Amino acid sequence: MKNSILEELKWRGLIKQITNESKILDAQNNNDAVYCGFDPTADSLHVGHLMMIITLKRFADYNFKPIALIGGATGMIGDPSFKANERVLQTKDQVEHNINKISAQLKQIIPNVNFVNNNTWLSNISLIDFLRDIGKHFNLSYLLAKESIATRIQTGLSVTEFCYTMLQAYDFYYLYKNNNCSIQIGGSDQWGNITSGIDFISDTINKNNKAAGLTINLLTKSDGQKFGKTESGTIWLDKTKTSEYEFYQFWFNQTDQDSINLLKCLTFLTKEQIDNLIKEHQNQSSKHLLQKALASEMTKFVHQQQGLDKALKLTEAFFSGDLFSLTNDLFKMALNSLPNTQINKDTKVIDALIEVKAASSKREAREFLTNKAIMINNQIIEDENTLISSFDLIQNKYLLVKKGKKKYFVILIK
């Protein structure tokens, strides 16, 4: 473990921008609080949020008191920073539901985090008070110079969204004044909002204050694509939206280069541990040691040991073909994680492949069968006229179709 949080963040290549290094080091020595904001735009966080969740946990490991600010008020508006279009406004009930779900997720991941909801203080400010006590401290030219706002001026920016940065600035002011919170952290798009908060504190409390902030680099893949999106959509932290198995597989399927970067950015493995993994992987790359370490660390962090155990058991069952020994709970996870459909027991294999979307046409299905690329319940299938009723069923009603090395589909027999 490094001597300071800044050393830790630097060797991992995480820092994008920082306002004042010495203030952050002083805050570490004084056991100050640090906060990161999460707007409740959905009822679950996703892997794109992990960079900030893990960074908040890193600060906690270095003597800071972690605060997760849930934007009960700002979530009703939506942060315009670097967004192409204005967000669709959510109802109060939607926001409240999302807050409850997200808070439960974060509490499970970072048990010692202190939750605050900015609706607690922002809802008590009248429009007149907002204009007089907050708005007068923000010069229009100052706000328009912010890159996060300037990029939206041409496409259209409502007054509602325009005020967002002032509300977030007040959040920092409030936590600084009431929670001994001197540090705000955020993603690379939050620099303008963070510096607005520091300027507001300087203007209203004391120019010689201890407020500071830093932003974290955007996580991208080695090919330049934004990290976190897949062909099947968003990878959620909620296991009812993305199962532990799917979550594990998402990390396991990263490239070698991306795995190395992700191990540095998102895990708590030391530099020595990561360097040793890289050496071992280079000597026996077929074992995918980097990917296994990454998938295990991330799944355990989000879903605890129990979730990792489930993911590993299901992964092993798919690899070995021993699906008949799976518990009902694990097979339900497989069913929820894979494309599946109901098919009549008298259906031929060639038609079943199309129905379950393992093939787009009979011609393509025949190609797969000819090339021995189709397995049903771990048995290679070549005859297109085989009836699916001829196979032993898993739990008396399921068949598992494997296409190639990694694609799985589940057939439920009617």
Swiss-Prot record:
Gene3D superfamilies found in the cross-reference section: HUPs, RNA-binding S4 domain, Tyrosyl-Transfer RNA Synthetase
Residues spanned by motif 'HIGH' region: 40-49
Record localization: Cytoplasm
SUPFAM superfamilies linked to this entry: Alpha-L RNA-binding motif, Nucleotidylyl transferase
Residues reported to bind L-tyrosine: 35, 164, 168
GO molecular function: ATP binding; RNA binding; tyrosine-tRNA ligase activity
Motif 'KMSKS' region mapped to chain: 226-230
Enzyme class: ligase
Role summary: Catalyzes the attachment of tyrosine to tRNA(Tyr) in a two-step reaction: tyrosine is first activated by ATP to form Tyr-AMP and then transferred to the acceptor end of tRNA(Tyr).
Family membership noted in the UniProt record: Belongs to the class-I aminoacyl-tRNA synthetase family. TyrS type 1 subfamily.
UniProt-recorded name of the protein: Tyrosine--tRNA ligase
Organism: Mycoplasma mycoides subsp. mycoides SC (strain CCUG 32753 / NCTC 10114 / PG1)
